[in-house]
């Protein structure tokens, strides 16, 4: 019973569902609306605003099977993955949560009941820990649950600071925190290790399987602990650890999920030793990489994308170590989908894009991997001591794409340490890229906090009376503001849409007798809408009743652009494929910008098809239907969700005929015909696997078409024709240009042949070899190659160096006859000269080219060439 990981997941969720908990889907690995986190790393992340009192849900009890990643940032397990039994970059955290509902006693009882009655773990194999001062938890365990006092261990501050304890949980430097109690499983005395709190606690005998956090405080940047609005509960149980216990194995890598992935990786690569640690690394890394791509992260050189790149490249390196000779990593995705079962639904939906992203990154890295490993191997073989210098580490990073932890991984296998300080010094000028991943450490509490709620009436009304409930000046709450003040006004109800889902906030005015507040933007602050702007007349106090007036023209134009993004999204999926998902958008009154997943430039014919499809739906004049429904019902209807957004149990669904259905809280037109016209203005790539379309609608689209028509008419006039003949006349002109270029090249070749005859006479003989060093005047840089070829034919055994200085630049070419390349190499010759004229270059031993930016140094540089050649011909 409950032998498979999938069965355990189902049993856990069903147990808590039957105890009054709402089963909530795993949130994205990219945390929504939380600047303090790089990745979702705990089950409670998606409920952080609920714990802080900034968000409300329709339920007070929840249970989840949350996908988590710990790699990069503060929570980073990457270096240990593959070398220990329980470290992973990706794991599933089973959790149950109480938002001001039950507290310590029920939380403890739920955990104990599930482990001992549902899973039937022997009670004698379990012991628990509590925070040193948490007498309440101790008493519950001892008196209510019946755990003997000797099996309840108090853990104090053991990490060098107040509240720095294994039994005091905090997500970061700020945010929700509180004491916790943990349940440990004893694997038996045949495994080394001691109970928690003992000198041998780091052994593998006693393993933590359940952690219950009593969420009582919100830690400020100052260190102050403020009580949360309602005491809450956050629990977590790693599914991999409990699966190992239920399946009778000690290492997480021996459970069903990992056995299947390891076996498949071994089959693809051709490995027979299934205990190889590199297979463990690969099996772990495919989980984090595949789910990260599925959640919208693409390999890049900054932020989350760079962490993903590091993980992929570490896996590829381990595959290379096992003998992989071609792309293998992406081939594990189907097996991953199969073994993850219901937890892989989102991954299955994006399988095509995930496989393409992983394959593209693997193939890109493969081009430099072998050479980089060769350089690293040589450096390690020549190393005296046990430390690899930072310069070599930087070279591998900068030239061959080796993340530092990949180099450290190789060094670790040979008991070599990496000079990280030296590496940091070497890449100081490029640190901005690598530091992007650290920019997620912003103080979550630094943003303006508004403890109020604003009702939104702007779906149906653009004007309405409202009462001022709060005023903020320079980030501080104030009772009143005066004319000229830039402030934030909070109302009890508003028709102003607050920026969300890519749609910009409304503009307009708030007015009363003698009072006018010009709203330049509307933003969300928790449950409140903040109207940002300037008081242009009068004075304004909390409690004042105003008339709120949205700028109707701006709202209308914004609605055109928002509604058409839904049509565009659906059209892209029809034309390019269902792997297309929205990665972001910007909708304002002037234009729309739509980012989406796709692995190549959209072909002109495809763009035309998308545009025509959208305009067809506009002409069909579909009525936009809006409905409130449960999120599960919306998903069953096929509603598309917006990337990065968080959704409650009840959602708003916008439908346009049978063409588009999306979850959306934004404002829209009444019918698609209101959009009038849709015109794409640009398409391009913004990141690996992410494309961007910019477009206009309505009057802006008409103006764009008129501008294009005017340019076409101007071109027709220049070509002395009409708009119908522009293409034909351009083809004629292009054909003429091609013929002129051909004629010109033939003339240049004749001139080069004539010039070479004259130049050949300037050669000097050095040890029986013709040497020609010449600065040329009136010769185009493009003619150097042909001239050099002519001279080599005439001079036979020769070394040639020609230079041209024009328009502030230097062009160089070196040629060496085949009989001399053993003594003089053209690449070395041209590089020597280029270095003296502010440039660089290279090429083959018999021919090489270079450029420079210091023509004033060319004469001096050429004067050194003859001695340099003479020395090598001696």
Curated annotation (Swiss-Prot):
Q: Name one GO biological process term.
A: negative regulation of DNA-templated transcription
In which domain of life is the source organism classified?
Bacteria
Q: Does the keyword Metal-binding apply?
A: yes
> What binding details are noted for the cofactor?
Binds 1 zinc ion per subunit.
Which coenzymes or cofactors are required? Zn(2+)
Q: What's its top-level EC category?
A: ligase
Under PANTHER family, the record lists: ALANINE--TRNA LIGASE, CYTOPLASMIC (PTHR11777:SF9), ALANYL-TRNA SYNTHETASE (PTHR11777)
Provide the protein name: Alanine--tRNA ligase
Organism, by scientific name, is Shewanella sp. (strain MR-7)
> Gene name, please?
alaS
